[in-house]
Design a protein with these regions (language model features):
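Cytoplasmic helix-loop-helix junction between adjacent transmembrane helices
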Residues: 1-25
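Glycine-rich segments within core transmembrane alpha-helices of 12-TM secondary carriers
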Residues: 17-43, 67, 249-261
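Helix-loop-helix hairpin linking two adjacent transmembrane segments in secondary transporters
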Residues: 27-75
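Multi-pass alpha-helical transporter architecture, strongest
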Residues: 71-78, 232, 283-307
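Extracytoplasmic gate region of multi-pass secondary transporters
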Residues: 114-165, 257-262
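Cytoplasmic membrane-interface "Motif A"-like loop-to-helix N-cap segments
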Residues: 178-189
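C-terminal ends and interior cores of transmembrane alpha-helices
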Residues: 190-206
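A late C-terminal transmembrane helix in Major Facilitator Superfamily
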Residues: 236-272
Length: 307
């Protein structure tokens, strides 16, 4: 949330979607590096080898440590965005003139003044929370356990999907600058409503290339959503609650719906005996996200100080 807010407030308004798409792209790059490493290990040593099981899986975590340290030092050198600094100056001027009372806490302000925006934003973020998990995390496990695909093939498909995700998410951000955030997010939600159940049927064909095409189509639908979501959330809330509104809506959606997606998916399979039961949950979430976006307002191209 912080990274997206920072980028959005620094970006030119007609390219905000493109620049904000760097945030989900950077997340996917981390997953891509991990997937490439896993694919290499599985093909070189075997998925069940002592090297992989005992300590090979730890190597990506060790390599990520220095990146976190580097990010910390970059972060402490950054200055607040011009939009935020302008808000701070306005508050100080108001206090100096005696026109302002005590500043309201952001969380309290969200629930008292921006509750509708918060609820809609949670609905919009739900598709990312569940869609990202289902497409890029759950499906590899599903292919191995339900479709009985070899781990190295499932890992290869995931790697190709992640490359596609990173490549197209910038295009999605750019298109959202051209066509608007609302249209893009509605398109993504509608795509998941229509395509998810047939996609799970096709996954059970056991044909590698059919499964790959299905995964890529779902991945492209996800990029339409994820490449747009960050800029949409930043444009939904005014500067004084922008970070809090983004963080609360996005993280609540991920904690409640994305975090439970694994348990719900496997529980649905166990209860119904239907191997494509997780698709029904994905469609349910997509319907909720679609409703939220239909009820939302378009803010594409606005100056963030005007939101």
């Amino acid at each position: 949330a912080g990274a997206a807010t920072f980028i959005a407030e620094y970006s030119p308004k007609n390219h905000r979607g493109f620049y904000c798409s760097m945030v989900p792209a950077s997340t996917a790059v981390g997953l891509l590096v991990g997937s490439l490493f896993a694919t290499w290990m599985f093909n070189t040593f075997g998925a069940s080898s002592d090297f992989v099981v005992n300590w090979g899986w730890r190597i990506p975590f060790v390599l990520a440590g220095p990146l976190g340290i580097g990010a910390y030092f970059v972060n402490i050198q950054l200055e607040d965005s011009p939009t935020y600094q302008a808000m701070q100056r306005a508050l100080k001027d108001a206090e100096a003139s005696g026109a302002a009372g005590a500043p309201e806490r952001p969380i309290h302000c969200l629930f008292t003044k921006h509750l509708r925006k918060l609820i809609i934003s949670i609905g919009a973020a739900m598709l990312n929370a569940v869609g990202f998990y289902v497409v890029l995390t759950y499906l590899p496990v599903y292919l191995e356990t339900a479709v009985m695909m070899p781990k190295n093939e499932a890992s290869l498909i995931t790697t190709i999907a992640l490359v596609t995700y990173v490549a197209f998410i910038f295009a999605s951000g750019h298109l959202s600058d051209k066509f608007g955030r609302k249209k893009m997010l509605i398109t993504a939600a509608a795509g998941f409503v229509v395509f998810t159940i047939p996609a799970f049927w096709l996954l059970n064909t056991l044909d590698f290339f059919t499964i790959l095409v299905v995964e890529l189509v779902m991945c492209l639908m996800l990029t339409i959503n994820d490449g747009t979501l960050s800029s949409y959330l930043c444009e939904t809330f005014p500067t004084d609650v922008r970070y809090s509104g983004f963080a609360l809506s996005f993280n609540l959606a991920n904690a409640i719906f994305g975090g439970s997606a694994s348990y719900i998916s496997f529980a649905l399979i166990n209860v119904t005996g239907d191997p494509i039961a997780p698709a029904y949950y994905m469609v349910f979430i997509a319907v909720l996200a679609l409703g939220a976006m239909i009820a939302s307002h378009e803010h594409t191209g606005k100056d963030l100080s005007e939101v």
